[in-house]
């Protein structure tokens, strides 16, 4: 079996869904388990519906619900124009889903109160609708397909909007559900992003969670491979919005891909890699508009050559500097510092320490006031805003001769605030002023990828 995940842009409209179904049809001999996101922009629309309902804006709620319903009904009518009976059934099912959703959002609108539980139910409807539509289309094209409700097998914690997968339950349920659904079928289809807790309450995995769903399902069924279908030809050496001459990477390691995702690459959800690594399942990032393209293969490390693969970045970060003479020759100081970050649920990226100073980076979107207040009780704390983080990523780059020189030689005119080398030898990261980010990434990529033989001297 294989897992084929199609993102929102790969199922956005008539043409995209037609292509996706054609692609699935070419892999029936591999027994595909198809995982789909909501149609492009539909999750955003559902967030708007939930926000409008929470504010009691009934007129906006009705307008947005009409937009949601019309988009899917019109799409069904277009895709199934040659199959009137299936079209009628599909329209009926789409209307049932929309009617149930409308009932909930009107209730929310009436009380002007939106719980996390109800928000999770609302925003998950995009995947329920898209998977329903595509299932009907696949059957209309002669691909016998069963629809699986992900909520019956993707079990998570009871955190409604950021459910943590319960791998034990997922490993127990997914193979059974998939095997049952595959009886007499050519393919099965299910939803990314959504699940439920052990009590049956609906949850979601958080934004971008469809990739994660696909990887978890792949792990559970011991998939031969996991295909992530997007609208790009694979993983690039840098963000093309910052760098003109980026290169597509034919293959990278699990570790490199995980670092790229964590440090800002947009192709994969950061958590996607972990379940696949556990079973050594290769992941292929492919382009649904160019299905014959090679894409990028993400493989186990021993199949990948040493060297630089990517220049990645996080645009909006802040640096928290913690200074205290009590650090010197004092056991437990670091533990105390990081317990405060943990207790306040503030995630730390880079860490740099000296005898009396700790510097860490955190995403600018995180609330840190309470953390800073608690740290200030026993240390001096300085926060630097408007910073960006740049990471050079590649297998064993920390061990390569001259790699630090190659990384920092182009940056002599730039202020570098802290440097961190990953313990896995896969990344070298540093912090710069946000206003200098674009030029730093451009220069670094130029010297590492385009003209590596022409490096300036220190």
PLM features: residue spans?
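A conserved regulatory-domain signal marking ACT and ACT-like small-molecule sensing domains
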Residues: 292-458
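Surface-exposed amphipathic alpha-helical tracts and adjacent flexible/coil segments at the periphery
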Residues: 268, 279, 289-296
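Nucleotide/pyrophosphate-binding catalytic subdomain
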Residues: 1-268, 273, 432-433, 452, ...
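Glycine-rich beta-alpha junction loops
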Residues: 39-40, 152, 232-234, 283, ...
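Short hydrophobic alpha-helical runs that function as membrane-insertion/retention elements
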Residues: 225-229, 283-285, 349-350
């Amino acid at each position: 079996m294989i897992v084929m995940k199609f993102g929102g842009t790969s199922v956005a409209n008539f043409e995209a869904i037609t292509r996706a179904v054609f692609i699935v049809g070419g892999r029936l001999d591999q027994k595909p388990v198809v995982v789909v996101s909501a149609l492009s922009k539909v999750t955003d629309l559902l967030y708007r519906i939930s926000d409008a309902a929470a504010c009691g804006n009934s007129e906006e709620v009705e307008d947005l619900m009409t937009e949601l319903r019309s988009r899917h009904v019109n799409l069904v009518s277009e895709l199934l124009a040659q199959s009137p009976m299936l079209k009628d059934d599909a329209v009926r099912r789409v209307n049932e889903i929309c009617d149930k959703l409308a009932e909930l959002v009107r209730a929310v609108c009436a009380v002007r109160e939106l719980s996390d539980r109800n928000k999770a139910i609302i925003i998950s409807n995009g995947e329920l609708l898209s998977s329903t539509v595509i299932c009907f289309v696949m059957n209309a094209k002669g691909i016998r397909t069963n629809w699986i409700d992900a909520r019956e097998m993707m079990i998570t914690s009871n955190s409604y909007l950021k459910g943590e997968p319960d791998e034990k339950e997922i490993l127990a349920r997914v193979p059974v559900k998939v095997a049952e659904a595959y009886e007499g079928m050519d393919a099965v289809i299910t939803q990314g992003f959504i699940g439920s807790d052990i009590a049956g309450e609906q949850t979601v995995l958080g934004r971008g969670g469809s990739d994660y769903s696909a990887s978890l399902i792949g792990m559970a069924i011991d998939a031969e491979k996991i295909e992530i279908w997007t609208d790009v030809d694979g993983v690039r050496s840098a963000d093309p919005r910052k760098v003109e001459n980026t290169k597509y990477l034919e293959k990278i390691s699990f570790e490199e891909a995980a670092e790229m995702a964590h440090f800002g690459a947009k192709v994969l959800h950061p958590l996607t890699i972990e379940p696949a690594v556990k079973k050594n399942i290769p992941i292929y990032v492919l382009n649904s508009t160019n299905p014959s393209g090679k894409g990028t293969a993400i493989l186990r490390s021993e199949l990948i050559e040493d060297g630089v693969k990517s220049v990645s970045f996080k645009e909006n970060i802040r640096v928290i500097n913690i200074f205290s003479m009590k650090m010197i020759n004092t056991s437990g100081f670091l533990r105390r510092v990081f317990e405060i970050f943990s207790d306040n649920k503030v995630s730390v990226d880079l860490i740099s320490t000296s005898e009396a100073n700790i510097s860490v980076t955190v995403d600018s979107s995180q609330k840190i006031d309470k953390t800073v207040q608690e740290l200030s009780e026993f240390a001096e704390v300085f926060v630097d805003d408007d910073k960006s983080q740049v990471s050079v990523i590649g297998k064993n780059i920390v061990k390569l001769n001259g790699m630090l020189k190659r990384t920092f030689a182009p940056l002599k005119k730039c202020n570098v605030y802290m440097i961190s080398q990953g313990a896995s030898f896969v990344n070298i990261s540093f912090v710069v002023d946000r206003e200098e980010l674009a030029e730093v990434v451009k220069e670094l990529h130029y010297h590492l990828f385009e003209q590596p033989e022409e490096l300036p001297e220190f």
